[in-house]
Amino acid sequence: MTVTVRFAPSPTGQIHIGNARTALFNWLFARRAGGSFVLRFDDTDVERSRREYADQIEIDLAWLGIKPDLTVRQSERFGLYNQAVEKLKEAGRLYPCYETAEELELRRKIRLSRRLPPIYGREALKLTEEQKAAYEAEGRKPHWRFLLPNFDSDPFSTGRTEIHWDDVIRGPQTVDLASMSDPVLVREDGTFLYTLPSVVDDIDLGITHVIRGDDHVTNTGAQIALFEALGAKAPCFGHHNLLTTVTGEGLSKRTGALSIASLRKAGIEPMAVASLAVLIGTSEAVTAYRDMEELAAHFEPASSSKSSAKFDPAELEALSRSLIQAMPFEAAAPRLAAMGVEGSIAEPFWNAVRGNIDKLSEAAEWWHIVMKGPEPTEFTEDDRNFVNEAFDLLPPEPWDRETWRSWTEKVKEKTGRKGKALFRPLRLALTGRESGPELADLLPLLGRERTLARQP
């Protein structure tokens, strides 16, 4: 069996790190098994779905290193769903209901007042053809419910009907179909709710494993029943824990600051996002891995906790920083070149500055300082005189890492300055900043000519 998984976002907004967690769980699961990854856009909600959101999702996934083997759109597959609807109707497994939302809410309250579970009582099954015609004459259109197999012969006499599956993340799971309402599969306007297209696509695309958030655990039972009603074997299921904000709120597409697009624009490294999204809330140590191969080697779905995990942006920033500061020049070179950081000193420059930056884009700022010089710096008269005296003591080239030590020793002997009084004015003159990379590393990159040009 070839493992085939899918990630099924709705293109109604930007995906966030919680969505990325699901995508990455699926991608890594397929990667380890030598399987396939399907990107399926759940865009049956034609009013809210936007192609620009779908395009952005593809960009976000590519940035994370996820390249689908197949991309499909539910909006192009309505014919398959209609065929499934007719099959279920013919089998007596899909029945029309005419209640309004207000009527259903009233029934729910009545059941609760009688200490009964607030599930649909299948009242629509009792409607005669005349009653249905009367409703339609009023202008009502039916929504269609899937008749769950939680009874022997009388649908009004339900009994405990257990659905079991061995969850690839949570282990053995059981749900009781008698504890849930018959799910609505088709709305009054003929559009489909999530469940039917999802199951039909999983069958048609040969999905072997459905890996998603644990908010879907309960409805897995109804979906397994729907697979069987359509004559198909249900795939394996896996349900990972969800991420929340640091305050415990659930993530949503409205949590814009946590969208993948915003994290990318903020300069966060993609492998920091991937590492944290996958490893947070598991028994694995949260470490920033350099690439997907490393992450896949440490990915263990069953290590996921059963409780939600809090996503802390500060932890993400720390992981991203650790990746930048450990990044070899070969990995950074293409991105540095795109910012104009290239040439014979690009590699020593990167090795000099990487330990002092949080985001790779900051390297461009230091490149400008090295090549063009800092903004003019204001000095006290004493510091200006000191810097000019120090610059008069600059040794001839060639310069290397020892040049800074030997130069500052001479300056110390000549001026009597030491410590901060010596180093701070020189750093400000050379870089315009109070802190930064080791000047022993920067000075050879500046060279004598560019250094003298910074004399105040």
Curated annotation (Swiss-Prot):
EC number of the protein: 6.1.1.17
Annotated motif 'HIGH' region, positions: 9-19
Compartments where found: Cytoplasm
Any one cellular-component term (Gene Ontology): cytoplasm
Catalysed reactions, semicolon-separated: tRNA(Glu) + L-glutamate + ATP = L-glutamyl-tRNA(Glu) + AMP + diphosphate
Coarse class of the protein's main subcellular location: cytoplasm
GO molecular function terms attached to this record: ATP binding; glutamate-tRNA ligase activity; tRNA binding
Listed PROSITE patterns: AA_TRNA_LIGASE_I
Positions of short motif 'KMSKS' region: 250-254
InterPro entries given in the database record: aa-tRNA-synth_I_cd-bd (IPR045462), aa-tRNA-synth_I_codon-bd_sub2 (IPR020751), aa-tRNA-synth_I_CS (IPR001412), aa_tRNA-synth_I_cd-bd_sf (IPR008925), Glu-tRNA-ligase_bac/mito (IPR004527), Glu/Gln-tRNA-synth (IPR000924), Glu/Gln-tRNA-synth_Ib_cat-dom (IPR020058), GluQ/Sye (IPR049940)
Transmembrane segments: none
Keyword DNA repair attributed: no
Alphabetical GO biological process terms: glutamyl-tRNA aminoacylation
Annotated keywords: Aminoacyl-tRNA synthetase, ATP-binding, Cytoplasm, Ligase, Nucleotide-binding, Protein biosynthesis
Superkingdom, natural source: Bacteria
A matching Pfam family: Anticodon_2
Residues at which ATP binds: K253
NCBIfam families for the chain: gltX_bact (TIGR00464)
PANTHER family hit by this protein: GLUTAMATE--TRNA LIGASE (PTHR43311), GLUTAMATE--TRNA LIGASE, MITOCHONDRIAL-RELATED (PTHR43311:SF2)
Family of this protein: Belongs to the class-I aminoacyl-tRNA synthetase family. Glutamate--tRNA ligase type 1 subfamily.
Protein role: Catalyzes the attachment of glutamate to tRNA(Glu) in a two-step reaction: glutamate is first activated by ATP to form Glu-AMP and then transferred to the acceptor end of tRNA(Glu).
Subunit structure: Monomer.
Protein name: Glutamate--tRNA ligase 1
Organism: Chelativorans sp. (strain BNC1)
Taxonomic lineage of the native organism: Bacteria, Pseudomonadati, Pseudomonadota, Alphaproteobacteria, Hyphomicrobiales
